Amino acid sequence: TVMAFVSLQLFGISTEKQRSALLGSVFAYPQSVDTTVSDTTSFSYIKYRLSTDRRNFILLAVPTMWTVAHSGERHHVGEAYDRIEMQKDRIVKVTRVLQRSTVPHNRKTLPTLVKYLTPNVYGQTLISDFILSPFNRHNRRFYRYRTISFFDGTTTITFRPKVKSTQLVSGMATVDTRTGKILTATFNGEYDMINFSLSVKMGTKGVSSLLPQQCALDAQFKFIGNKISSRYESTFGLPKLLADSTTNANDTLLLDRVRPYPLTPGDERIFAQHEARARKASNDTTANKRERDKAKKRWDAVGETMLGRISSDFGTEKRGSLRINPLLNPLYFGYSG
């Protein structure tokens, strides 16, 4: 009994009434924020690392993994600096300013994961339109919540789905007990063959408190014996440091200027190895090398045709468009085991 009393005093375990009141404050927090501010432009930095833990020939049939499977390398890194245009609390346009990647041709790999880096924590859908946020009033019926309040003015909320579904997540969040503002949150789930853990640190005040300031995503893609691990990190709200004329540039020196934190030794090593291979390849001017390049380009073209979408506009002023889905699409594969 004494221990229970001490626990209640130290941790402020919430009653059902207190829990409902706190959740109500969290759900209502977006309405307490003035979003009538003028449109804004800010900048973001993204760094990612891909590791091929296991692979077989079937990985070649995944459209967004063709270049990784075909490259022969097991580790890839990349970074990007983007211009973000906002309207109220929504991102309306993202422009790539700088990028650097060891993925061949700077191709996008698992592009769906980028959507996880801009979660709409208070929205009805947390990520794009396929995962339901536990911090929206309309989704409360799908989740179970537990809360523990602390004397520092914060409360920890843990949540889990009432039923198993790939559209629901589990995790925890730290919120301001008085206002219901979410300070940090972690979401764990699985969707479309991707297991993920997403950690979010929210902005501090005003409209920025409705948006992530920093995100870290750990994800694993598993498909018929293949396993790709990835780590994505993003930082938002960075200042303007470059001229507006800079777009989609591959410039290491400029990235050194805008990068909000240094690369890890492991990232530096992968970049250095990639650049060393590129220098060696550029110095190889033999006929055999030219033949290898031609063969590689032919295989790249085959891969793009078989596994990538083909789209084209036609007519004056682009009045019509044509899109052909991949000839081989793993999402339509069937298998049993």
Where are these regions (language model features)?
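Hydrophobic h-region of N-terminal signal peptides that target proteins for export
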Residues: 2-12
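Gly/Pro-enriched, hydrophobic low-complexity segments
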Residues: 11-12, 147, 152-250
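Solvent-exposed N-terminal domain segments of exported/luminal and surface proteins
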Residues: 13-110, 262, 267-268, 275
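Generic beta-strand hydrophobic packing signal
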Residues: 36, 40, 185, 213-215, ...
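Flexible, membrane-facing loop/turn or short amphipathic-helix motifs
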Residues: 52-55, 186-191, 223-227, 328-335
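Ordered hydrophobic segments in well-structured contexts
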Residues: 65-67, 78-85, 133, 142-147, ...
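Flexible, processing/modification-adjacent segments and terminal tails
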Residues: 92-155, 159-170, 194
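Outer-membrane beta-barrel initiation region
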Residues: 121-149, 230, 246-337
